[in-house]
From Swiss-Prot:
The lineage of its organism: Bacteria, Pseudomonadati, Pseudomonadota, Gammaproteobacteria, Oceanospirillales. It is an enzyme of class 7 (translocase). NDH-1 shuttles electrons from NADH, via FMN and iron-sulfur (Fe-S) centers, to quinones in the respiratory chain. The immediate electron acceptor for the enzyme in this species is believed to be ubiquinone. Couples the redox reaction to proton translocation (for every two electrons transferred, four hydrogen ions are translocated across the cytoplasmic membrane), and thus conserves the redox energy in a proton gradient. Belongs to the complex I 20 kDa subunit family. [4Fe-4S] cluster binds at C69, C70, C135, C164. The gene is nuoB. This is NADH-quinone oxidoreductase subunit B.
Length: 226
């Protein structure tokens, strides 16, 4: 389990970054190397990882946190017509220490960024972040000094949900993409002090994956049919 400690007198990073973002690099699946080294233990560890990831992705507890109008659409996904309980994410937590993932839903102002960082640091590993809405993704229409131009400037984001605001169905699709990403993760099965060495698969962009289907559409529905 990894804790992020932030000192009050912490010196700024050489590159000007205010948050210790994770370092990413391309690598092969560690399970494949283990299988060639020892077939039995490699397969056993692969099964254990898959089982643990299956339990994690079907019991994601969200943190009750919102910033703007996108939060209204997020809470709508918890109502009966959408039934987010189908995905095991109906248990909303009021404390970040009991939550598994945080949804940044709405406009993130500069004064709010340190608060979001502190709440994120209070979450225990493993933890994930969903950026919901245009304002959280890139600042939206607020290209001004007081709005952070994307929460990925100071937080590691796992899934981006576009829209202004996104519909509840878009949030549910983002939740499913997060589940797919968690299933492919490789994390230590025991307690680890220091770098956890998390392996995450490269997820394809949905914009590129659905490009041919979008181009094939020739007749658009009217607003009252959407």
């Amino acid at each position: 389990m990894q804790y992020t400690l932030t000192r009050a007198d912490q010196e700024p990073a050489p590159d000007g970054a205010s948050y210790p973002l994770g370092r990413r690099e391309s690598t092969s699946d560690p399970m494949q190397e283990q299988v060639h080294r020892n077939v039995f233990t490699g397969k056993l560890e692969d099964v254990l990882n898959s089982t643990v990831n299956w339990g994690r992705k079907h019991s994601l507890w969200p943190y009750n946190f919102g910033l703007s109008c996108c939060y209204v659409e997020m809470t709508t996904a918890f109502t009966a017509p959408h039934d987010v309980a189908r995905f095991g994410s109906e248990v909303i937590r009021a404390s970040p220490r009991q939550a598994d993932f945080m949804v940044i839903a709405g406009t993130c102002f500069i004064k709010m960024a340190p608060v979001i960082q502190q709440l994120y640091d209070q979450m225990l590993e493993p933890k994930w972040v969903i950026s919901m809405g245009s304002c959280a993704n890139s600042g939206g229409m607020y290209d001004i000094y007081s709005v952070v131009q994307g929460v990925d400037k100071f937080l590691p984001v796992d899934v981006y949900v576009p829209g202004c605001p996104p519909r509840p169905e878009a949030f549910l699709q983002g939740l499913q993409l997060l589940q797919d990403s968690i299933q492919e993760e490789r994390r230590p099965l025991s307690w680890v002090v220091g770098d956890q060495g998390v392996y995450r698969a490269d997820m394809p962009s949905q914009r590129e994956a659905n490009r041919d289907r979008r181009i094939a559409v020739t007749e658009l529905r009217s607003p009252d049919e959407v």
